[in-house]
């Protein structure tokens, strides 16, 4: 069964081919990719390598984690699997303080770590104004980024209508 490995802290100069070359020593690769910014085409500093078997993936993790590739000490571990029919990417939207998730975005565009379109106030309504997403236009979230509340200052008080579209991307349930 295929096993997907996350490779983080990549050099901006690491390409799909150089990533494959470094990992192919440890087994048969079925897929490999360095994630790139959709606007600039530049590496986002992480990628994924899929091995044919779990044993090959484990061998690569043991051998390459904290080793140098293209001048950077890379981090290698098993990729987080998403349940089938899950949230479609990102971290599943931000819920309000009381667990409400009535109008929340359900993650970017189904990519790797896509940001939701807006943040919610307690009660299930989204905050108005600002541009709270951090990953471009609902794109890929770089590991280590933590979602922040607010756009241009303190969170809005009270409740308003849910944000509709705008730069936040898709604002419905992604099922």
Curated annotation (Swiss-Prot):
Disrupted gene: phenotype observed: In the yeast form, results in slower proliferation as well as increased cell size. Does not cause an increased amount of bipolar cells and leads to significantly longer hyphae and empty sections at the basal pole.
Amino acid composition bias (Gly residues), ranges on this chain: 132-141, 163-175
Major subcellular site: other
Subcellular localization, as worded in the UniProt entry: Endosome
Alphabetical UniProt keywords: Endosome, mRNA transport, RNA-binding, Transport
Gene3D superfamilies: 3.30.70.330
Gene Ontology biological process terms in this record: mRNA transport
Start-end of Low complexity biased regions: 122-131, 142-162
Coiled coil: none
CDD domains for this protein: RRM2_NsCP33_like (cd21608)
Keyword field contains RNA-binding: yes
Domain RRM per the UniProt entry, residue ranges: 3-81
Pfam families, alphabetized: RRM_1
GO molecular function, one term: RNA binding
Stretch list, region Disordered: 114-175
PROSITE patterns (UniProt xref): RRM
Statement: the UniProt record of this protein carries the keyword Ligase: no
Family the entry assigns: Belongs to the glycine-rich RNA-binding protein family.
Quaternary data: Part of large ribonucleoprotein complexes (mRNPs) containing RNA-binding proteins RRM4 and PAB1, endosome-binding protein UPA1, core scaffold protein UPA2 and associated factor GRP1.
Purpose: Component of endosomal mRNA transport that regulates polarity of the infectious hyphae by transporting a broad spectrum of cargo mRNAs from the nucleus to cell poles.
Protein name: Glycine-rich RNA-binding protein 1
Organism: Mycosarcoma maydis (Corn smut fungus)
């Amino acid at each position: 069964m295929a096993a997907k490995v996350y490779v983080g802290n990549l050099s901006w100069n690491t390409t799909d081919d150089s990533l494959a070359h470094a990992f192919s020593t440890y087994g048969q690769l079925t897929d490999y990719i360095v994630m790139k910014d959709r606007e600039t085409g530049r590496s986002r500093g992480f990628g994924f390598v899929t091995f044919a078997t779990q044993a090959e993936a484990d061998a690569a993790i043991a051998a390459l984690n904290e080793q140098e590739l293209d001048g950077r000490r890379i981090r290698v571990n098993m990729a987080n699997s998403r349940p089938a029919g899950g949230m479609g990417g990102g971290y599943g939207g931000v819920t309000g303080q009381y667990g409400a998730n009535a109008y929340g975005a359900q993650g970017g565009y189904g990519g790797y770590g896509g940001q939701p379109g807006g943040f919610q106030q307690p009660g299930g309504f989204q905050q108005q104004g600002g541009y709270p997403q951090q990953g471009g236009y609902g794109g890929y979230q770089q590991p280590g980024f933590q979602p922040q509340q607010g756009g241009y200052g303190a969170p809005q008080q009270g409740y308003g209508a849910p944000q509709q579209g705008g730069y936040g991307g898709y604002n419905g349930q992604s099922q």
